From Swiss-Prot:
It is found in: Secreted; Host cell. It comes from the Bacteria. Wx(3-6)D/E motifs are required for pathogenicity. The keyword Secreted applies. This is Type III effector DspE. GO terms for cellular component: extracellular region; host cell. A motif (WxxxE 1) lies at residues 464-468. Disruption phenotype: Mutant does not elicit plant cell death in either potato or N.benthamiana. The gene is dspE. Residues 22-44, 59-74 have a biased composition (Polar residues). Major virulence factor that may function as a water- and solute-permeable channel dedicated to creating osmotic/water potential perturbation and a water- and nutrient-rich apoplast in which bacteria multiply within the infected plant tissues. Required for plant cell death in N.benthamiana leaves and leaf cell death in S.tuberosum. Essential for pathogenicity. Does not suppress callose formation. A motif (WxxxE 3) lies at residues 660-667. Keywords: Secreted, Virulence. A motif (WxxxE 2) lies at residues 514-520.
């Protein structure tokens, strides 16, 4: 039983304080009430004098001035056409900040306000809305509604996909009722300055046949909507007056019985606000917290004050103060009240005969005696209604006075089950003005509904959908003022954010207004990586900015969904390396891996985190404080990484980068004072968008350091200026102009056109075009005495193949050195020693030595994990470990070849002499190698010709990495032995510092800087891929260094750069301005080939057959930049292959059929030796080609702070490519192979004219000059492609496979050209051998309808669980399981320290639970995943990271249309799994909004679509278990994708690629060559990503991203118009 602290029941309204705004206006507080007592309105109770201008409590407290003249009421304004355009408007900022209101044209006069406050029933005439239906059931809007509201309605229920059959208007109630053809009812209501539109949860029965207003009629009142059919059927739905308004807006009006009748109240930020009707502004009523504002069964308004007192805001009475928190309440029409309180997650019901009566505790139980854990309560005149923690509804007769318990009976909800599903949940109760009770319910998708309780008051029936609604609400006085300029960060493409009153605010570009986010912070800073970071309670967290839409429920309950992206910030996981106990008070961030923090002692430390992990890269570096005086208030870094510190006395100091980053300079480092324009009075410190130092003394001036001078600006406090187009947008637009193509009407096929003139390609656009002289110099000849480029390229290639790359010599030499060290180490006799893990565990260095011991453990763990990874990699290749990870003790014995050395016994001897741990994976594997006589063969590098490295060894570098790790473990053994000498002696700081220094030198220097470690950490395992990617990097370094390089020439054209320097600058700004899912790529391609044909003579065919064949090779280099989650993703790619081709062609002279004369008859003699021979020739050809290509790529991530330096290094050409790559992080190396087969056909019709250059009848060789004009057609008849690749990173491996079956007619093209050719032909007895070359001018139009499928499987090294993982899991479980037992257990788990123990407790409790909701399903799945991860991590294994099946189409119609073979298959085999088109069609059939989105995506031209499928949860869980138990490998996972029943639709993505490519194709005389360079960009047009719950077939919801997610111009204009009127669209 709870203790009740009694207070006097009387409560003056001046004590009634504002209440907390519920998380949503739907979470009503199920309150109680007492008898009604006279109470004055909150405004009349002395909150301010009505005769004086009211002061706005929100914002900075500025006053609102009364106006001498005012416009009409909002209702009248809305009824007058064009009023919003003609009325003068005050600046919005004055309203947001609570400043003076210059004009208030939309609110009533003071006299009208007085009438309203005093409860007069006089009302303004209803607005004329003029909503009608046309003959197709589409809404037609007149001018009666506000323009902005009309726009929003047109964008939602006004769409074509929403046909209506009946409409009724109630002008007195400002209400429109609608019925659609499915029987769903809609209502649009206006009430003063509020507008809502919503629809019924269920559907009414509709008559058969064609529906219209002739056979369906509607009638509506504020209380009810009735639908009648000509057949006599009728259905009615309660509207319950203002109840839906109150639930949707949170605005409640005092009843007429209250002295403040008509006064409007609402909650905002935990406070109670009242509407000042004279000015139409919400004003805070009191500083006391209130929550759960709601109307109760007696029609009066109640709220909970300070969480412990129930207050009747209408009568002024209050309950006793409860010692426990009030979680729900209720009051009935008889004045009886019920209160639910909660302590330790257990609730207690209290009943009171009147609000101020002594509470009577009542126990709740079922008939079988089981307790009921109540979450919501409601009292009617006769019954007690309870909703429990599972959302189940119960009822019991109202307990009589003194009854200690109530026996509950489950309520019957068949009608609600039929509409919302059996798994719906009752979450609360609501009441209308007449005290009628309705239940609040949530369906499976989380949408909220109001449900009338039926005639018996106990069985809920379907009512109205509150989630799928449109709500326009007056927020004047509640909206956020713009933060001060000194507290604002401009994040460029991510908009603006600011810090105000301890909360991060963001600028909503859709409404042109500042809004508060849920993120709290004491500091908001911009890192040098241009990312935002917050400091709160000693934790530094990166901010992520949302660029997706809100979540939309799947189904047809998204009528009022308006796609829009609000750039809302959210805080990520706290950066590692600091604890809350450190009391960090200030920060300066380079990036998420490097930052400086000031702790509670005032000391500064530089923290470094290993990229991609939560491990520290080095111990925190204490920074010097010499010369720095006073207590540090704030710190920052400028663009040169100069560190600035501001003390609390307003003095500013600086320390150069070299002095604070280099520990060797710390002793001599000295902070220097900075002279400022406000000397000694600096109040705030920061940087501008270019990271220049910025200071302020007050809110009026900002001083920015520019060089040695200061620039002073006076912020105007105005809304941000419209953002200028991003450079990336500008370049994309330019490339779009250069890309010629369009979509064929009524199809999804795009045709693209390309032009070439005399071998020069890229003539498609004359607007984006390089000079011919520049292109000739770049591709063909440099007009200097240098060796021609093609010859030099070939010579370099031969040299590199034989001797490797000079820049990689440090890697070659280090391999040799490490092998020599290994031999030297193992040649020394070693005695039996304790393993390293045990040695470290036994160390006792006291509290001061804990950091040293922890770093020893971390380094040992790194080395053991690294050696295990290398050994497993080698083991898989050698057959000692199978695909599933199981060890094969038999191995694959083999003999060594010339110069090879077996590393296995040498490595094993070294490991046994310096054992790592008793469970060392590497040592176990090496013993298996030795025992099974399976060698680890490696050829030592030498200086001999062609032997600098072994390019045939697929794991040469991985083997050397194992050697390095083994040697490092031996060195760590020795260091640990020396540290062990200090164990138990309580060593001093000097001795510990010496050991720490030595450990750091080993870890970061000898080991960390080793070139073999760096290369293998990037993912390189062999020299072949290393040299390929090195070649790619080197190629682009040359490309951007040389102004006349082909890549530079085309890049300057695309960037419209005047010089190379200008191009590099524009390249930086373009890359930095890339938005999410945008990329830019620079391409260089060259190739050559040889071909021959033979004209066969003497055949019976009507035409001479021409067989032919050829071989060609091509190499392609690509450098791409794309926007990633943590910066800019960079990819260097090189691909190339050989293509073999055979052909068969023929032609026939059709002159006689077209002209009536043969070619011979039309021949004209020029002279005795030469003649002119015209003809019309029809020809055809069939060719088959087979291509084998290699792919290599290097991917890594750069922060925005690193990118400019990286591009400078790329273009300078003065640094080694390895140093350039060292700037990046999270590298991965990709190597793959592609095999493709194509069967093509072509046909041509040409008008030709030839002149024999040799004498007539010359034999056996003749020469001809021929000109022709003609048309061509070609098609790709058959094609098949198979490819596979592996991308290897330090912590992850990704396998990609693509095995595309034979596909028919993927491509077709038509062209026209004019050609001049010359050559010779040699005649033999069997036929003729032609040798011709040609030059042409032509245009080609190609249609592409290719389909490509691939499967991607990602494995990630399992990391041991950390506190953040358990925190995330408990948060998920806490929100999903709200029964007291689970809640109490989770509370206990949060207090535990060890993740292993926490996981064990959670497993014990949740192992046997079955998910009842989607949230519980997700929670249990997360728990299972962490279990697998923790188990695998303890064995140094990998877990499944990502797995998906993607299908890409260039024909967008295939998104919803099956191909021919699928259609035939569906007819022949009924058991076939659904195709992608089948899946999508099924979804859009149930979801009109999604259908509209897909249709809009398909309307794009020159676009491609990618459909991704993923494994269902149960299948994925099976695979994860199989990987854990080593029963499933890569091939088993890929095999599951062959059964479509294992898959679900993950996403639909449509993107657009634009490109400018320029180059030359040289005329061919047996041998031909080509050279091209290009710039391309890719942009996401739209992505629909799906989320699933327990139902793995039908999505629960979806989100939008890309262009499709952004609000259209009509919507943003409407939102801005509303904002100007002080109105907002909720949601």
């Amino acid at each position: 039983m709870q203790k009740i602290q009694h207070v006097q029941p009387g409560l003056s309204t001046s004590e009634i304080a504002p209440a907390t705004l519920a998380k949503t206006s739907l979470s009503q507080g199920n309150s109680t009430s007492a008898s009604q007592k006279g109470a004055q309105s909150l405004i009349q109770q002395g909150l301010h004098d009505k005769n004086k201008p009211p002061e706005l409590e929100q914002g900075n407290g500025s006053s609102v001035r009364s106006q001498d003249s005012r416009s009409t009421t909002l209702r009248e304004l809305f009824s007058s056409e064009g009023a919003s355009q003609s009325a003068p408007r005050a600046p919005r900022d004055s309203l947001a900040s609570g400043g003076p209101i210059q004009s208030l044209p939309r609110f009533a006069s003071a006299e009208a306000a007085e009438i309203k406050i005093s409860g007069s029933t006089t009302s303004t005439p209803a607005a004329k809305s003029d909503i009608t239906l046309d003959s197709h059931g589409k809404l037609q809007f007149g001018k009666g509604l506000p323009e902005a509201l009309t726009t929003l309605l047109q964008q939602t229920i006004g769409k074509n996909s929403q046909p209506f059959v009946a409409h009724h208007e109630n002008q007195d109630a400002q209400q429109h009722a609608l019925a659609d053809k499915s029987g769903r009812l809609f209502v649009i209501q206006s009430d003063d300055n509020q507008h809502i539109a919503l629809h019924s949860s269920g559907r009414s029965a509709m008559p058969a046949g064609k529906l219209s207003s002739n056979n369906v009629q509607l009638e509506s009142t504020p209380e009810r909507i009735a639908l009648k059919t000509t057949a006599g059927e009728s259905t009615s739905m309660p509207l319950s007056g203002r109840m839906n308004h109150e639930l949707l807006t949170g605005v409640h009006r005092q009843p007429t019985s209250a002295s403040g009748a008509g006064e409007q109240l609402r909650l905002h930020d935990g406070k109670l606000f009242a509407l000042n009707t004279e000015f139409g502004v919400w004003q805070q009523s009191s500083d006391v917290a209130h929550s759960q504002l709601s109307r109760q069964g007696d029609g009066q308004l109640y709220a909970v004050k300070d969480d412990h007192t129930l207050s009747n805001l209408s009568s002024g009475t209050a309950s006793s103060t409860f010692s426990d928190k009030i979680t729900a309440f209720s009051a009935n029409q008889n004045g009886q009240s019920a209160v639910l309180t909660e302590q330790d997650h257990l609730t207690q019901l209290h009943l009171m005969s009147t609000l101020d009566a002594t509470p009577q505790p009542v126990a709740l139980k079922l008939e079988n005696g089981d307790p009921v854990f109540a979450k919501a309560v409601n009292l009617t005149a006769e019954h007690l209604l309870i909703a429990d923690n599972d959302g189940k509804l119960y009822h019991a007769p109202l307990p009589k006075a003194g009854e200690p318990h109530a026996t509950l009976t489950p309520a019957s909800t068949p009608e609600l089950n039929a509409v919302l599903g059996d798994d719906h949940r009752i979450t609360g109760f609501a009441h209308d003005e007449h005290g009628q009770t309705q239940a609040l319910a949530t369906d499976r998708q989380g949408q909220k509904h109001v449900a009338p309780l039926g005639q018996n008051g106990l069985s809920p029936t379907p009512g109205w959908n509150l989630s799928d609604s449109l709500v326009v609400d007056n927020k004047l006085g509640l909206t956020t003022a713009a933060p001060e300029a000194k507290d604002t960060l401009d994040l460029g493409r991510l908009g603006q954010i600011g810090l105000q009153e301890g909360k991060v605010h963001f600028y909503n570009g859709n409404t042109k207004n500042w809004e508060a986010s849920s993120v709290e912070a004491s500091q908001l800073k911009r890192g040098l990586d241009n990312q935002a970071y917050t400091l709160k309670d000693g934790e530094i967290k990166p901010l992520s900015i949302n660029q997706k839409s809100d979540t939309f429920a799947h189904g047809d309950n998204t009528v009022f969904a308006l796609p829009q992206v609000r750039m809302t910030p959210s805080a990520g996981t706290a950066l590692p390396g600091i604890d809350k106990d450190d009391g960090v008070s200030a920060m300066a961030v380079i990036n998420r891996n490097k930052f400086i923090a000031v702790d509670k002692q005032g000391d500064l430390h530089f923290h470094q985190i290993k990229p991609g992990t939560d491990k520290i890269a080095a111990p925190p570096l204490a920074l010097p404080k010499n010369g720095l005086s006073g207590e540090i208030q704030d710190i920052t870094l400028d663009h040169q990484q100069t560190l600035f510190a501001l003390n609390k006395d307003g003095q500013l100091f600086q320390l150069p980068k070299t002095d604070w980053q280099n520990a060797a300079n710390h002793d001599s480092a000295q902070w220097q004072p900075v002279k400022t324009p406000v000397e000694g009075k600096v109040s705030s410190l920061g940087t501008d968008a270019q990271h220049h130092l910025q200071i302020a003394h007050d809110d009026h001036e900002l001083h920015t350091q520019q060089g040695n001078a200061w620039k002073t600006t006076v912020p105007k406090g105005e809304a941000p200026l419209p953002a200028e187009p991003r450079d990336a947008e500008t370049v994309f637009g330019r490339l779009d102009v250069a890309t010629k193509g369009m979509k064929i009407p009524l199809t999804g096929v795009t045709v693209k056109a390309d032009f070439q003139v005399l071998g020069k390609t890229g003539e498609d656009s004359q607007q984006v075009k390089s000079k011919l002289s520049d292109l000739l110099r770049a591709h063909l000849v440099s007009f200097t005495l240098d060796m021609p480029r093609p010859i030099k390229t070939f010579a370099d290639h031969v040299q590199h193949q034989l001797n490797g790359r000079e820049g990689l010599k440090p890697v070659y030499d280090m391999q040799t050195e490490l092998l020599k060290k290994l031999d030297a180490t193992t040649s020394q006799p070693q005695g039996t020693v304790t393993d390293l893990a045990t040695k470290i565990d036994k160390l006792d260095l006291g509290d001061k030595g804990k950091p040293l011991v922890n770093l020893l453990k971390q380094f040992h763990t790194e080395l053991e994990s690294s050696s295990a990874k290398a050994a497993l990699l080698i083991g898989r290749q050698q057959g000692v470990v199978n695909d599933n990870g199981v060890m094969n003790t038999e191995g694959k014995p083999a003999s060594l070849h010339s110069r090879e050395k077996d590393l296995a016994p040498v490595l094993l001897a070294a490991m046994e002499s310096h054992p790592s741990s008793k469970t060392s994976t590497a040592a176990t594997l090496l013993k298996t190698f030795v025992d099974s006589k399976t060698p680890i063969a490696q050829k030592p590098n030498s200086e001999a010709f062609g032997q600098q490295r072994d390019t045939s060894d697929a794991l040469s570098l991985a083997k050397t990495r194992l050697v390095l790790d083994t040697l490092a473990l031996g060195d760590l053994h020795k260091l640990t032995d020396r540290i062990g000498a200090l164990s138990g002696t309580s060593p001093g700081e000097a001795a510990l510092a010496s050991m720490m220094k030595e450990l750091n030198a080993m870890r970061q220097g000898n080991y960390g800087e080793n070139p073999v470690k760096k290369m293998t950490d990037m993912g390189f395992t062999n020299h072949k891929s290393l040299e390929a990617d090195y070649d790619s990097v080197k190629t682009f370094m040359k490309a951007f260094r040389k102004e006349d390089n082909a890549v530079s020439v085309t890049s300057k054209t695309v960037m419209q750069a005047a010089s190379q320097t200008d191009m590099i600058d524009k390249m930086k700004s373009t890359v930095l301005s890339l938005d999410s899912n945008e990329s830019i790529a620079f391409n260089r391609t060259y190739g050559g080939g040889a071909s021959m044909s033979f004209v066969v003579s003497g055949t019976p065919l009507p035409f001479p057959p021409v067989p032919g064949g050829g071989v060609s090779g091509e190499r392609n280099y690509n450098l791409s930049f794309s926007r990633g989650e943590n910066g800019i993703n960079v990819a260097f790619e090189r691909s190339g292959g050989i293509t073999g081709k055979v052909s068969y062609s023929g032609g026939y002279d059709v002159s006689e059929y077209l002209t009536g004369k043969t070619s011979a008859q039309m021949t004209q003699d020029i002279n005795s030796k030469h003649s002119f021979a015209p003809d019309v020739r029809a020809s055809f050809g069939v060719s088959a080609s087979l291509q084998v290509a290699q792919q290599n790529a290097l991917n890594f991530t750069l922060s925005e702070e690193e990118l400019p330096g990286f591009i400078d290094g790329l273009s300078s050409g003065t640094i080694n490519p390895l140093a350039l790559l060292d700037k990046g992080e999270q590298h991965s190396v990709k190597a793959g192979k592609t095999v493709s087969f194509n069967l093509d056909g072509n046909a041509a019709l040409e008008l030709r004219g030839g002149i024999n250059l040799t004498e007539k009848g010359a034999a056996p060789t003749s020469a001809t000059l021929r000109g022709s004009v003609g048309v061509t057609a070609s098609a790709n008849v058959l094609s098949a492609t198979s490819s596979s690749s592996v991308a290897q990173g330090e912590k992850s491996t990704t396998y990609t496979e693509s095995d595309n079956r034979l596909r028919f007619m993927n491509q077709a093209a038509m062209g026209a050209n004019a050609t001049l050719s010359a050559g010779a032909a040699r005649t033999t007895p069997d036929g003729t051998v032609p040798f011709f070359t040609s030059a042409s001018i032509g245009v080609n139009v190609a249609a592409d309808s290719r389909t490509n499928q691939s499967i991607s499987l990602g494995m990630k090294k399992a990391e041991p669980l950390e506190k953040k993982d358990i925190d995330a899991l408990t948060k998920t479980l806490n929100s999903a399981f709200n029964d007291p037992a689970s809640q109490l257990l989770i509370d206990g788990v949060k207090k535990m320290a060890e993740p292993d123990d926490q996981l064990a407790i959670l497993n014990t409790h949740f192992a046997d639970k079955t998910a009842k909701t989607d949230d519980q399903h997700q929670g249990l799945m997360s728990l299972k995943k962490l279990n697998v991860r923790q188990d695998v991590a303890q064995r140094d294994g990998a877990t499944l990271d990502s797995v998906k099946h993607t299908t890409s189409y260039t024909n967008l119609s295939k998104l919803t249309e099956n191909g021919l073979f699928q259609v035939i298959g569906n007819h022949l085999f009924s058991s076939l799994p659904p195709s992608n088109a089948d899946r999508i069609n099924q979804l859009i059939a149930d979801n009109p909004a999604l259908k509209d989105i897909v249709s809009r995506l398909q309307d794009n031209d020159r676009a491609s679509v990618t459909v991704s499928l993923e494994l269902k949860d149960d299948v994925r869980e099976k695979i994860e278990k199989g990987i854990q138990n080593k029963t499933h490998g890569k091939d088993d996972v890929i095999a599951l994708f062959k059964d479509g029943n294992n898959l679900r639709l993950a996403s639909i993505e449509v993107s657009k690629a634009v490109k400018k490519s320029e180059g030359f194709n040289t005329p061919a005389v047996i041998i031909n060559a080509s050279s091209r360079a290009g710039v391309s960009m890719n942009k996401l047009l739209g992505n629909v990503s799906f989320s699933y719950g327990q139902d793995q077939t039908v999505p629960q919801s979806y989100k939008l991203s890309g262009e499709i997610a952004k609000a259209n111009p009509a919507t943003t204009n409407a939102l801005q118009q509303l904002q100007q009127e002080g109105l907002q669209l909720n949601g």
